[in-house]
A protein has these predicted regions:
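Catalytic alpha/large subunits of respiratory electron-transfer oxidoreductases
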Residues: 1-98
């Protein structure tokens, strides 16, 4: 595995992802703890990705990082974010281009 840590969830997830795509890409989620701004887009990480929120909240606590959440409905992540953007379905592409 490309990352220095693993769990039963990540090991199984990475194995399935690699089987489907041929390779694992992306960044190490632990890098979020070193960020000044964490953007969580299109997922309710508070309720479904505890590992993501652990690193995001660590960045907030240790570095004063801001958390921005983007989704099409209000959820736990939007509620905990410093800035929560609730978009109409299909409009997030325009936001991505504008950023």
């Amino acid at each position: 595995m490309p990352f220095a840590y693993s769990s039963i969830c990540t090991t199984l997830g990475w194995t399935g992802y690699i089987a489907g795509t041929g390779r694992l890409g992306g960044v190490d989620p632990r890098e979020m703890a070193k960020s000044d701004l964490v953007v969580i887009w299109g997922t309710n990480a508070v309720n479904t990705q505890v590992n993501v929120m652990t690193h995001a909240t660590r960045a907030r606590k240790e570095r004063g990082a801001k958390i921005v959440a983007v989704d099409i409905y209000r959820n736990g992540t939007i509620e905990q974010a410093d800035l929560g953007l609730v978009l109409r379905p299909g409009t997030d592409g325009a936001l991505a281009c504008a950023v």
